[in-house]
UniProtKB/Swiss-Prot annotation:
Protein name, per record: Protein TolB homolog
S-S pairs: none
Localization (cell): Periplasm
Family classification: Belongs to the TolB family.
Gene that this sequence comes from: tolB
Main location (coarse class): periplasm
Organism (species): Protochlamydia amoebophila (strain UWE25)
Keywords: Periplasm, Signal
Keyword Signal attributed: yes
Residues spanning the signal sequence: 1-30
Stored InterPro entries: 6-blade_b-propeller_TolB-like, PD40
Gene3D superfamilies (alphabetical): TolB, C-terminal domain, TolB, N-terminal domain
GO cellular component, one term: periplasmic space
Keyword Nucleotide-binding recorded: no
Amino acid sequence: MYAFFFKTSNHWIQFLICFCLSLAPFFAHSIDEDPIVVRLSTDSSLVPLYLAPFTIEQTNFSPSYLKQLEDILTFDLNHNGSTYLSKRNASNDQLANAGELEDLGIAQTWQAQNIFYVIKGIIKENFLQVFILNTNTQNLKKCDPVMLTGDLSQDRRLIHRIADTIHKALFGVEGVASTKILYTVKTPLVDNKQKLSSEVWEADYDGENARQITQEKSFCVNPTYIPPKKGFLSGNFLYVSYQAGQSKIYIANLKDGKGQRLLKLKGNQLMPTLSQQRDKIAFISDATGNPDLFLQLFNPETGVVGKPQQIFSAKLATQSTPSFNPDGTKVAFVSDKDGSPKIYVIAIPEPGTSLKNIKATLITKRNRESSAPAWSPDGTKIAYCSRTDGIRQIWIYDFTTNQEKQLTQGPINKENPSWAPNSLHLVYNSADTNDSQLYLINLNQTEATRITSGKGEKRYPNWELRFDR
């Protein structure tokens, strides 16, 4: 049982930590503008594909290296939430290399196996070109050749972009394979094993190409990307650091990770989140004596605008983990104002609005304890974690049906869900003594995949938000 009421700043900040733990264009002309088929509904079945082995015409790359690239594409196509790869066999591999892919006879053989599309890659010298066959129409789409570098880190990202190009060719919307995720890694300090540090890291969506961003040798939590302008990538992020003693919000760029204080506000600050419009930051602070919800106007070019506004407070209650809706007019957050922690939504009040006139709407009703809401980029859902039969699981609240649905299963506690830009995928962290790693899941494939491993506790994942370019 958690104790929810504290009298000092240090007490509530310790509680909030425990509360959180408990609770540029690519291939622009390579495909037609019109998609082959538009089909991306969480109620639809996955589309079967066949990925033929890469055909090697002439190259200096080793077979083992090319197999690594093929495995990356395999992972991407099996985890995009829209397709799955049919089991490979020798006869189909031969079929993919028997003459022209779009030949009627070949296409009919694929159809007979209920394979909708065939993906074939040809490597010639340093270039990889991908072909997409629609077995129903015999339509063959060709992606522009891309030059491989021989550096696995760089080529992995090229393969991710190819996977997203394939997804757009089939469904008319971008995939998420080329996106990135921020998170924290907690480890003992190298020069002082008795002291723990938590630094901000960034990785590809599959957990690979991980790199450390901050170098504070202090304790960092709650990293969150600053949403980019349309057509751009995220370049900066917010996070919370204890380098000055109390928890404060910092802003840093992804290149050097050197943080600067964002707010000149007394007390502790935690859990910053930004609106998609990049003009508002919601966060939690005890500046007025209680851990309450605050709003700060923001300009990504010049910084904070004016002073922060307290937008929700409840007597003897703790507020936490805010999340904006897509148009920035509402905030979901956690409060234990009615006893146990639950998720509420408020409309952003006008400046000067009395706190007494701000009414919160209860969202989660099925479970006693709920936390860490994350509003989907399309605005239709909120993901959150909720204690279910003693285990914290990821749940989804659907605004179209006003229903709550359990997404994850299993004995491991799950926390801190974060949506991908497509509002289909989620990343979250496990939170057990011997397992604090990141997991990937989507609404069409509810068997989670672990994407991190190794030493250190990985927590607070935040999926970068991208807008159509």
